[in-house]
Amino acid sequence: MVKYKSRLKEIRQGTGLTIDQVVVATGISKRTIITIENEEGANPSVDTVKRLIKYFEISFEELYP
């Protein structure tokens, strides 16, 4: 099974946002955000990925290159 690493941390930090700001804006739990940012092969739900893509106005390929 191929494991993909998210660019979420890089994208979030590039916008100057804190994890807490992303949590409030997206409704995604802090634990989930931290897991996606720090664990290669994290397996977020489709809904979570869609929320992040919409919030940051990015494509799936930008989040998971």
Predicted regions and their residues:
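A short, Lys/Arg-rich alpha-helix, primarily the initiator
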Residues: 1-14
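Conserved hydrophobic/aromatic packing and binding residues within compact polymer-binding modules
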Residues: 8, 22, 33-36, 63
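The alpha-helix within a helix-turn-helix
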Residues: 12, 23, 53
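Serine/threonine-rich, low-complexity intrinsically disordered segments
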Residues: 17-20, 28
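DNA major-groove recognition helix of helix-turn-helix/homeodomain DNA-binding modules
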Residues: 27, 47-62
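Recognition helix of helix-turn-helix/homeodomain-like DNA-binding domains
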Residues: 28-43
